[in-house]
């Protein structure tokens, strides 16, 4: 993740705006750090509760397994947030050493890719359940979901290797140690030839991260949920608005939470003007914090009427994270047989 590396831009933005306009702008680092600490506290408690419920209080199904790993990726992300917040508060000064610089940022990258891939896997699993029910009944099992989860974690780890290679600490000769990407892979940071090579490597990493970590998964999610919604409507499987709400929530939350981060990464790559960098960084921090903390809550409360929560939190979890009802599954199988 490049958010730690980008805080230098925020500090420079505040200074340059103050010098050019004479009007001091509030330093956003305190607000950003406070948001990260708040997200950490809420995220650890809420995601920890979700993991406990999904693991010990619910039936082991494809949906609950995939949601468990999705929320596990959110939980891992929240554990890194205090270290990011500390770096922001110290003007991007990294005090945790080179090894943790690599470890924390590669871990954030793994959890980012994993969360995106699990959201895609959930949409694909529902696609097969509704459009190919016979195949799903034979092959869509908890064991199948476990293998998918393992493949996702391995893929996310492989795609995060660049952070282990390029992430390093660097002395800026101003009394600060920065944890940032060194795409030059050299101690000669000032060499023009090395900087050109580093720019190309940076661009390749950005394109790969944008395509594999946002655009392609987003298209997969839209395609799957569009086909699922159409099929369920045709076969009269929409007994309530619950499935539709969950689908819409998945698409909207995915786009809103991740688009600002990739926009900011693109602006950093193109060395955009300070103000857009300043604004998109703050927005990216807020939306990513929102994603790790609030997205599971959105799934929960769009899954069933809020009144159910007053009766039983477990019933609410079951209505949200379990597969479609046996009646709906039977109707789908019958429809498939007729076809």
Curated annotation (Swiss-Prot):
Principal localization reads membrane
Q: Which residues lie on this side of the membrane: Extracellular?
A: 1-30, 87-103, 166-209, 269-283
What UniProt keywords apply to this chain's record, in alphabetical order?
Answer: Cell membrane, Disulfide bond, G-protein coupled receptor, Glycoprotein, Membrane, Receptor, Transducer, Transmembrane, Transmembrane helix
* Glycosylation, residue list: 5, 12, 19
**Disulphide connectivity of cysteines:** 101-179
Expression (tissue specificity): Expressed predominantly in lung, spleen and testis.
Membrane topology, as annotated: Multi-pass membrane protein
Q: Does the keyword Disulfide bond apply?
A: yes
Q: Name one GO cellular component term.
A: plasma membrane
Where is this protein found? Answer: Cell membrane
The residue ranges crossing the membrane are: 31-53, 65-86, 104-124, 144-165, 210-230, 247-268, 284-303
Q: Which Pfam families match?
A: 7tm_1
Q: Which GO terms describe its molecular function?
A: G protein-coupled receptor activity
What's the superkingdom here?
Answer: Eukaryota
Those parts of the protein on the Cytoplasmic side are 54-64, 125-143, 231-246, 304-339
Q: What does this protein do?
A: Orphan receptor; could be a chemoattractant receptor.
Q: Which family does it belong to?
A: Belongs to the G-protein coupled receptor 1 family.
The record's section on PANTHER family has:
CHEMOTACTIC RECEPTOR (PTHR24225), G-PROTEIN COUPLED RECEPTOR 33-RELATED (PTHR24225:SF5)
Q: What is this protein called?
A: Probable G-protein coupled receptor 33
| Organism (species) | Mus musculus
* Upper taxonomic lineage: Eukaryota, Metazoa, Chordata, Craniata, Vertebrata
């Amino acid at each position: 993740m490049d958010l730690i590396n980008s805080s230098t831009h925020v500090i420079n933005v505040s200074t340059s705006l103050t010098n050019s306009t004479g009007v001091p702008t509030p330093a956003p680092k305190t607000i950003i750090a406070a948001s990260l600490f708040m997200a950490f506290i809420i995220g650890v408690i809420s995601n920890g509760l979700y993991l406990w419920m999904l693991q010990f209080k619910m039936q082991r199904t494809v949906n609950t397994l995939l949601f468990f790993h999705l929320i596990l990726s959110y939980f891992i992300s929240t554990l890194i947030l205090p270290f990011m917040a500390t770096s922001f508060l110290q003007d991007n000064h990294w005090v945790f050493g080179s090894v943790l610089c690599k470890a924390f940022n590669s871990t954030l990258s793994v959890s980012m890719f994993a969360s995106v891939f699990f959201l895609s896997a959930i949409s694909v699993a529902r696609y097969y359940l509704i459009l190919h029910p016979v195949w799903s009944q034979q092959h869509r099992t908890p064991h199948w979901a476990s293998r998918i989860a393992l493949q996702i974690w391995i893929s996310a780890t492989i795609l995060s290797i660049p952070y282990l290679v390029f992430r390093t600490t660097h002395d800026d000769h101003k009394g600060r140690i920065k944890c940032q990407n060194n795409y030059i892979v050299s101690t000669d940071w000032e060499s023009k030839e090395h900087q050109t090579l580093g720019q190309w490597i940076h661009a390749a990493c950005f394109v790969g991260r944008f395509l594999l970590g946002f655009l392609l998964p987003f298209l997969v999610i839209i395609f799957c949920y569009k086909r699922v919604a159409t099929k369920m409507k045709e076969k009269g499987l929409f007994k309530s608005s619950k499935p539709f709400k969950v689908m819409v929530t998945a698409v909207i939350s995915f786009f809103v939470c991740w688009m600002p981060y990739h926009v900011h990464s693109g602006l950093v790559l193109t060395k955009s003007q300070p103000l857009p960098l300043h604004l998109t960084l703050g927005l990216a921090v807020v939306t990513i914090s929102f994603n790790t903390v609030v997205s599971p809550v959105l799934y929960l409360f769009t899954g069933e009427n809020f009144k159910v929560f007053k009766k039983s939190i477990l019933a609410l979890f079951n209505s949200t994270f379990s597969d479609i009802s046996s009646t709906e599954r039977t109707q789908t199988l019958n429809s498939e047989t007729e076809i």
